[in-house]
Amino acid sequence: MQDEAVTENTASTGPQAGPPLVVNVQYVKDLSFEVPGAPQIFAALRTQPQVDLNLDVQVRRLEEQAHIYEVVLAIRAEAVERVEGEEKANTVFIAELSYGGVFTLNGIPDESIEPVLLVECPRLLFPFARTILATVTREGGFPPVQLQPIDFVALWQARRAQQQQETVGNA
């Protein structure tokens, strides 16, 4: 008799929509590694290059009828050697990586979609992008670029603050 009650309760809950966040696929969307001064740069490099990093999160909805999105981490690492007495720095290498994922959101409230796409999805992609960038720079003949953990919450909040300032400025 108890089994019947459990069966009835289970049946009344309806079909499950699946997990709230599904990673459908992850992929390298674009990858570029340039050493403009090769091969001379390897003999001429006198100091540890300074690596300037730029990271952006891009989101695009793939299907209007479903909550399916592409999230891309766009990372640019440019290593330069600043030589004392010279005005212009020498570019050692430029690495650019766009690492993407396709995500399906199930049953996530509308007010939570933006932080999931701009914080949680990049957090899932980041370790893979970090490894790819380190491998590419190492295989390019340089010490691997080791990205430190990124505070995606702070990036998202900064983006929102900038958008609010632009909205106020245009009003």
UniProtKB/Swiss-Prot annotation:
Q: From what superkingdom does this record's organism come?
A: Bacteria
Disulfide bridge partners, by residue number: none
Q: Name one Pfam family in it.
A: SecB
Keyword Transport in annotation = yes
Q: Which keywords belong to this entry?
A: Chaperone, Cytoplasm, Protein transport, Translocation, Transport
Listed GO MF terms: unfolded protein binding
- Gene Ontology biological process terms in this record: protein folding; protein tetramerization; protein transport
InterPro entries xrefs: SecB, SecB-like_sf
Cross-referenced Gene3D superfamilies? SecB-like (3.10.420.10)
State the SUPFAM superfamilies in the record.
SecB-like
Which compartments is it annotated to reside in? Cytoplasm
Query: Which coarse location class describes where this protein primarily resides?
Result: cytoplasm
Gene Ontology CC: one annotated term:
cytoplasm
Similarity section: Belongs to the SecB family.
* Quaternary organization: Homotetramer, a dimer of dimers. One homotetramer interacts with 1 SecA dimer.
Instruction: Briefly state the protein's biological role.
Output: One of the proteins required for the normal export of preproteins out of the cell cytoplasm. It is a molecular chaperone that binds to a subset of precursor proteins, maintaining them in a translocation-competent state. It also specifically binds to its receptor SecA.
Name this protein carries in UniProt: Protein-export protein SecB
Q: Which organism is it from?
A: Granulibacter bethesdensis (strain ATCC BAA-1260 / CGDNIH1)
Q: List the taxonomic lineage.
A: Bacteria, Pseudomonadati, Pseudomonadota, Alphaproteobacteria, Acetobacterales
